[in-house]
A protein has these predicted regions:
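Cleavable N-terminal export/targeting peptides
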Residues: 1-29
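Residues that define the transmembrane beta-barrel architecture of outer-membrane proteins
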Residues: 28, 49-53, 60, 77-81, ...
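Outer membrane beta-barrel transmembrane domains
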Residues: 174-210
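Short glycine/proline- and aromatic-enriched beta-strand/turn motifs that initiate or cap beta-hairpins
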Residues: 22-73
């Protein structure tokens, strides 16, 4: 879901993976990136144990951002296709993302089955404040449509909030700390419990230097107090 990530963009949909290279006279509004991760973690939830590839393309102009992103485990255990749009003004971002999970047998998928009772899409609305003068961010999100249902088939409106802080040691070395919690009984606790802390994350980012080339890398420690689980992941980022 991501973003799933990460890190990708918008603190779970708000971080932009940057390419390190020669500057051009005029930047293109289009971008493309690739993340290689040792496993897929998102908001304290483990989506599989296999290394996962996250390709992404984006378009950004005058505060408007649109993206398409995939998530593919190398053992075939997970597939994901995400689309999203957002708008940023100063320190505030609002957006909508659509997360879709194809089955392992592609011909059985019905991407355009959009009836709220039957669709496999998960549609989320979110708002983010990211400080300009202070390195803090706050994100609140809610699933507003799609497969986020309870056993009775009713929309759960699973909601999540996250508070984070970033500290930069140097231009290429920083650490991000965040705490996230589900706000109601829903997806993040398997519809078993209301408010709970489900994600405590410490992420260190740096760049490996090879002459004039820099390869962004990160290492993350993730703790989910609700599930009593902890994880460690590493990622490489390539800007295209």
């Amino acid at each position: 879901m991501f973003l799933k990530k990460i890190y990708i963009f918008l603190p779970l949909l708000a971080m932009t993976i940057m390419a390190y290279g020669e500057e051009t006279a005029k930047e293109s509004p289009f971008s493309a990136s690739l993340e290689l991760s040792t496993k897929y973690m998102w908001r304290g939830i483990e989506y599989g144990t296999a290394p996962t590839v996250f390709p992404m393309i984006g378009y950004n102009t005058h505060g408007f951002n649109a993206f398409a992103m995939g998530g593919y485990a190398i053992d075939g255990s997970h597939q994901e296709v995400d689309l999203g749009v957002s708008y940023t003004s100063s320190e505030f971002t609002v957006g909508v993302s659509d997360y879709y999970y194809p089955s392992s047998v592609g011909e059985k998928d019905q991407y355009f089955k959009l009836s709220n009772r039957e669709t496999g899409h998960w549609v989320e609305a979110y708002a983010t404040w990211a400080g300009i003068k202070v390195p803090l961010w706050v994100t609140v999100s809610t699933y507003i449509f799609g497969a986020d249902k309870n056993t009775d088939g009713k929309q759960m409106y699973s909601s999540y909030a996250e508070v984070g802080y970033t500290h930069s040691f140097t231009e290429d070395n920083n650490i991000a700390l965040c705490v996230g919690a589900n706000l109601n009984k829903g997806f993040y606790t398997n519809n078993q419990s209301g408010f709970n802390v489900v994600n405590i994350n410490a992420k260190y980012s740096t760049a490996l230097k090879f002459g004039n080339f820099k390869l962004p890398v990160s290492a993350s420690y993730v703790l989910n107090p609700y599930n009593n689980k902890s994880f460690f992941t590493m990622s490489l980022y390539f800007g295209l």
